[in-house]
């Protein structure tokens, strides 16, 4: 779908210079002399490169709609993560490296959303929060309540997060997968 250069919004995916780019930041500029334009920070969806580009309001760009499909995480084998389509039971494999650091939060049976374009996976969305058990943390020091100090804790998936002093080893906590931070105790 063609859109004008001044209609680009953050989050839009456009086809530009032969690749797929996501608009990260958009700033509309109206200089005193000349026509208005949109200063757009783009991120390549395939290799992660960034690019700053100006689009005049008269220019048109191709806006791309990504296909979103729900998958269920099954297992990891030799650095490849296997997901299953819940409707067709078809399985796809994505490399752990491609998924990135957030792969540590994948749990058996977890539902994820894979974004793709023309059959090629471009992005993966995990749930915003996961419940994990603390396997190791320092004991609380009595009298250390004057300041709100956090202490490091090792989670069952090997990730370290900072937790409040009242959290102990063996407790289950809710972790934000985007920020990799402690949110609260699990119910």
Curated annotation (Swiss-Prot):
Q: Which GO terms describe its biological process?
A: peptide biosynthetic process
Q: Which InterPro entries match?
A: Elong-fact-P_C (IPR015365), NA-bd_OB-fold (IPR012340), Rib_uL2_dom2 (IPR014722), Transl_elong_fac_P/YeiP (IPR020599), Transl_elong_KOW-like (IPR013185), Transl_elong_P/YeiP_cen (IPR001059), Transl_elong_P/YeiP_CS (IPR013852), Transl_elongation_fac_P (IPR011768)
Q: Cite the Gene3D superfamilies for this sequence.
A: 2.30.30.30, Nucleic acid-binding proteins (2.40.50.140)
CDD domains attached to this UniProt entry: S1_EF-P_repeat_1, S1_EF-P_repeat_2
Recite the UniProt keywords alphabetically. Cytoplasm, Elongation factor, Protein biosynthesis
Pathway where it operates: Protein biosynthesis; polypeptide chain elongation
Subcellular location field = Cytoplasm
**SUPFAM superfamilies linked:** Nucleic acid-binding proteins, Translation proteins SH3-like domain
GO cellular component annotations of the record:
cytoplasm
For this UniProt entry, what is the primary localization, expressed as one broad class?
cytoplasm
Under Pfam families, the record lists: EFP, EFP_N, Elong-fact-P_C
Q: Which PROSITE patterns match?
A: EFP (PS01275)
Q: Name one GO molecular function term.
A: translation elongation factor activity
UniProt xrefs under NCBIfam families: efp, PRK00529.1
Q: Which family does it belong to?
A: Belongs to the elongation factor P family.
Q: Which HAMAP family match?
A: EF_P
Q: What does this protein do?
A: Involved in peptide bond synthesis. Stimulates efficient translation and peptide-bond synthesis on native or reconstituted 70S ribosomes in vitro. Probably functions indirectly by altering the affinity of the ribosome for aminoacyl-tRNA, thus increasing their reactivity as acceptors for peptidyl transferase.
In Swiss-Prot or TrEMBL terms, this protein is called: Elongation factor P
Q: Which organism is it from?
A: Parvibaculum lavamentivorans (strain DS-1 / DSM 13023 / NCIMB 13966)
**Gene label:** efp
